[in-house]
Amino acid sequence: MSVYPPIEGSEVFIARRRRLMAALGELPVALFAGDPSPRNYAANVHPYRAHSHFLYLTGTAWPGAVLLGEGDEWEIFATPPAPDDALWLGASATWDTLAAAIGVQAIRPLAELADAIVAHGGAAALATLPAIHPRSRAQQAALFARPWGLHDESLHGAVPLSEPDSALAEAMISVRLSHDAAALAHIRGAIQITHRGHLAGMALTSPGRRECEVRAAIEREFTAHGAVPAYGSIVSVAGEILHNEHSHQHMRAGDLLLVDAGAELHGWASDVTRTWPVSGKFSPTQRAMYDIVLQANIDAIDQVRPGVRYRDVHLQACRTLTRGLVDEGILRGDIDNLVERGAHALFFPHGVGHLLGLDVHDMEDLGDRAGYGPGRVRSQQFGLGYLRLDRDLAVDMVVTIEPGFYLVPAILQDPSLCGPFDRDGTLQRERLAAFADVRGIRIEDDVRCTSGAPEVLSAEIPKAAQAVMDCVSA
């Protein structure tokens, strides 16, 4: 793979490494870029994506490279190009050019890494983070003898790390939680491309077409503007399937199309969901539920301010949604009591959002260590237990706000979840049946926390009901 200098100037990466060192102290650090993963044989690989911690500090997608250093002294270790690389892969920047662009002192052959680690005090004194790619993980194991398992990046817990590695993880989290100007510029650029994609998808939507045609229109805009999908796009009339991987169905009049699609630009992600009527017009029940979800989105966004606990942002969305369900006669009871009991989670089972940055779920490779503040752990309550983020918000954090309403058979047919609400009359199934044409609605925005009112970075992507209908081709 050809390696190119980063888009930004070296001062961006020098500043980030200095902030990391200020948070960490004088521990030496090694971070791995990772390797391409094969699809079905060694030479047929998935598109390469550098590990985000390496990318954050270098701006460079460099397969197999390792960043090593401390203080202001940093080097990159990489495999020298093969004699025929230019034939197959094209010209690559010289190592001197790359070193200057990244702001490191030198780039050296990967074979010299082991001796360099010894020069920095040895593996026991050096901090690193678990690599994602299997080959890099094996390389780390050989160099550092760390006791990491294959599934240490579990969402529901902290990755077990040595003392130096744990210190690095906490320092990296503290630096990456709030974004610098260069990061925000890339996120804004990704969202602008996402805006184009969603408008293209809306314009192509009509009864009789397939979901994959809409997905292709969206992702064409990503490609045409130098971006890639930040994750597997969800484009589905089965909006009740939260992480639907399939887009093969034909769209019919009366369907709602849920589209969760975001562009990634220079490694920085966006994450936006809109839901629109295939026929170009909401039915009365669809419109009623859409407006409830939209109000939950608006009310939660308004809570995105410095010092506010993100769990409270989630609970605000839950209260607004529950109030709407009570108004529609689907639930009965006191709003706060219903939320405390988790009645809303029958229809809104996931958390209201997550961190956004280089990763679409930023830093989730570090598990709940990144998403949950010190002393905070996941709730055991259904619904609230899926909340990915429970930190106090700070200026220049970017989070998603994505409430939804879903009619999920696996939930609504589960006596252990619905039984208490059926028995005491809280859940009014006869009234709920009137909303059978609402399979799933989600409205998601990317929001920057500022010193004042929140900045909705994705505000230009239509979400008011009439604005959405006006964009649909039908």
Each predicted region: which residue ranges?
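Active-site neighborhoods and metal-handling regions in enzymes and metal-associated proteins
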Residues: 1-474
